[in-house]
């Protein structure tokens, strides 16, 4: 196999930087076009970074505070991480009738994990949508992962997670409500008004949701397995920041 010298490679990259296409570069320097293509592309290993928690190699992620906070809400409420042979898989379960919620949640996963497999499946005769992503570092990103159901064990945010939720509280609330919340019309006598509801079996997750609401000046009403927000100004702010499920 013939190996071209570094001066040829440097000359090729200089021509590419000037906007010359691969075919013309190959013709001028007398090298195969595929060689020019390989020189132009960064090596595949450069697509890897280091996990900030376990320090093992991982494909680069693209989390901003708002995206992570929203995905954390989706995961805590109706997400599950499971171990596979060589990686981990996170599944998020959503009601398929809310097509915009499902589409936007899938786009969120693809945005956060641009180099990892992301997909969608419909189950239960199409009534439930399952979004999934594969990564060996999901339990690093979501340390609430553990054996058994979340409502059967303690759930608490780590300090770095709390900082993100405090920086992007509305995104976190949006993830929770889109996963297992609702907007409904409350009727009391001759009065009708909108209310937001959020339900979960885990008292710890309800605590996190409630405290996030309180930090934003909202006035939630706590029940055993649910939280409601029905004051007019609170609902107006939630409509502006969270929206409705559709």
Model feature map: region roles:
Residues 1-246:
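Internal intein/HINT superfamily modules and their associated LAGLIDADG
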């Amino acid at each position: 196999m013939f190996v071209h010298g570094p001066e040829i490679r440097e000359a090729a990259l200089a021509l590419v930087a000037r906007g010359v296409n691969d075919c013309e570069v190959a013709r001028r320097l007398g090298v195969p076009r595929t060689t020019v293509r390989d020189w132009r592309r960064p090596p595949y290993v450069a697509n890897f970074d280091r996990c900030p928690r376990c320090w093992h190699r991982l494909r680069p992620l693209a989390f901003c505070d708002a995206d992570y906070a929203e995905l954390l809400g989706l995961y805590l409420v109706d997400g599950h991480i499971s171990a596979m042979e060589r990686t981990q898989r996170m599944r998020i379960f959503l009601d398929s009738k809310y097509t915009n919620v499902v589409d936007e949640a899938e786009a969120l996963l693809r945005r956060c994990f641009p180099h990892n497999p992301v997909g969608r499946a419909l189950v239960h005769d199409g009534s439930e949508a399952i979004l999934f992503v594969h990564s060996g570092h999901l339990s690093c990103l979501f340390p609430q992962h553990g054996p058994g159901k979340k409502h059967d064990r303690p759930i608490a945010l780590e300090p770095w997670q709390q900082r993100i939720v405090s920086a992007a509280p509305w995104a976190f609330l949006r993830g929770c409500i889109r996963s297992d919340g609702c907007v409904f019309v409350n009727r009391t006598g001759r009065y009708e008004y909108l209310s937001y509801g959020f339900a979960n079996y885990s008292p710890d997750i309800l605590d996190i949701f409630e405290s996030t609401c309180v930090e934003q000046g909202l006035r939630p009403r706590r029940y055993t397995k649910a939280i409601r927000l029905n004051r007019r100004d609170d609902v107006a702010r939630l409509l502006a920041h969270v929206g409705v499920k559709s």
